[in-house]
Regions:
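Flexible, acidic/histidine-containing loops and adjacent segments that form or flank the divalent-metal
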Residues: 1-105, 170-226
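Long, structured stretches of catalytic cores involved in phosphate-ester chemistry, encompassing
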Residues: 105-111, 115-206
Length: 226
């Protein structure tokens, strides 16, 4: 499949710029760094420690998913990046699951690999995969209707304590849209304690959401420069 799109071109250009700087003066300055992580053949993924307070566990893709994504009829989202971040702040441990656009096939595989080690899938904050699309947690049956995958729901449902789910999408309305999906939202709400709607955050309706950053920043989060 063709991975480069009009939207991705600036990202690839920036990656190339940073790669070209490697080994040269200035490569470690803010805005010039880059880390290269190779897809592993191990079903246990890859753990990368960036500092004593930040760790990334790459759950997907593994090599077979990366190779499959090169097939002519492949779904490129089968090679989407899934990372569970662990961030330690003031002695506390915060776990953040970023599922990219990973499909239900990927989440099925992740559950099969980690069902006996579910701590590796636990989170305080979950970014709903594929902008809260239904195809991250369900697949079509022979009649063309979506059936939910218990494996995928189990993989995504390892919430710690109360937890938050964030949907990076337009407002999720009660209709038959597949991306974002109202039905998928209900599944994520079911993962949260008491199905608390206030803990499901959507940027398109953020006027009703709790502030997750300082109001002293002119109501804008600070950019992260790496």
């Amino acid at each position: 499949p063709k991975f480069e799109t009009d939207e991705s071109k600036p990202v690839f250009q920036e990656i190339k710029r940073r790669l070209d700087l490697q080994g040269k003066q200035g490569s470690e300055l803010n805005g010039n760094r880059i880390s290269i992580l190779e897809a592993t053949s191990s079903s246990n993924g890859l753990v990368k420690t960036f500092s004593r307070n930040i760790e990334a566990h790459v759950l997907s893709p593994v090599k077979k998913e990366g190779e499959a994504s090169n097939a002519a009829q492949a779904d490129v989202n089968d090679a989407s990046l899934v990372i569970r971040w662990t961030v330690k702040v003031f002695g506390g441990m915060n776990r953040i699951m970023l599922g990219g656009d990973a499909t239900v096939e990927v989440w099925d595989r992740i559950w099969q690999n980690y069902q006996n080690n579910t701590d590796k899938l636990s989170w305080h904050i979950l970014l709903a995969p594929h902008h809260c699309a239904i195809d991250a947690i369900a697949r079509k049956n022979k009649d063309g209707k979506y059936e939910y995958s218990e494996n995928a729901l189990n993989a995504l449902g390892q919430v710690i304590s109360d937890g938050f789910v964030v949907s990076s999408s337009k407002e999720i309305k009660h209709n038959d849209d597949l991306l974002p999906s109202w039905e998928a939202k209900q599944k994520y709400l079911g993962m949260l304690k008491d199905a608390d709607e206030a803990r499901f955050l959507n940027p398109d309706t953020r006027a009703n959401a709790p502030l997750l950053y300082s109001p002293l920043q002119d109501d804008k989060p600070e950019p992260v420069v790496f």
